[in-house]
């Protein structure tokens, strides 16, 4: 396994990358500078970039200039909350749909939770805005929003919502939002083969549960499986391959401990629950996730890249 040290902004495109001494030679190019907390980005067909700033700005970087998109929804940018991920519909060229995740109260007076919205852009303004999922209830705990978005080869929409800092209530209860991976049709409707569709009390959009704070997500282009990474507490960051209806164990099983050094569980594996395919102790604070598919890097094709916020390297 190789480690490429970097000053991390967001995975590859916004990185100031340096290399350790290995046979491969890498260089970097600063694509966009003077960003505060960029959380997600997508390239458009003209190679311009849509970038989310956590503070609540959507930036269109085109021809070397930053244009702020107008008409954004209500966004509560506090601590870990704000404007988070962004993803294009697989048929964006034909339908123009763009998807974002963000923390909002949905006009409630108290707290916030993760929302998923789709919209189009016309004349640098959001139009046709549709909230296709809003996690409930709102919480005043402004952390663990999850919020990564991904489409699969069948145009199913997947997204994550973290446990919202309430590990003892949310992750193991399928009748509550939080600590879950969700699956919807692109318009927000619930697939009839979702795993808990016949459970009267369950949140029907749930696809898997028992997660802490999944903030990396990618479809493996070779196996078509959904891969995620999630933040552990003190130790216990994980990589998981998502299976329909599966329980990933949080907080009943973990390789991590409380931030103060005490244990909250003595178990790292439980029969009937999924174990991570990889975990980190100590934590690396994973951020960003992408499979290498380009023939430009033949020796790395198929490898997975994950950035570390703590140690400031790119993990392969």
Regions found by a protein language model. Give the residues of each.
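Bacterial N-terminal signal peptides that target proteins for export
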Residues: 1-9
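Hydrophobic residues within membrane-embedded alpha helices
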Residues: 9-12, 32
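Acidic, Gly/Ser/Thr-rich repeat motifs that build Ca2+-stabilized beta-propeller blades
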Residues: 21-167, 216-219, 224-232, 282-316
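Beta-propeller domain segments
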Residues: 81-83, 91-93, 164-316
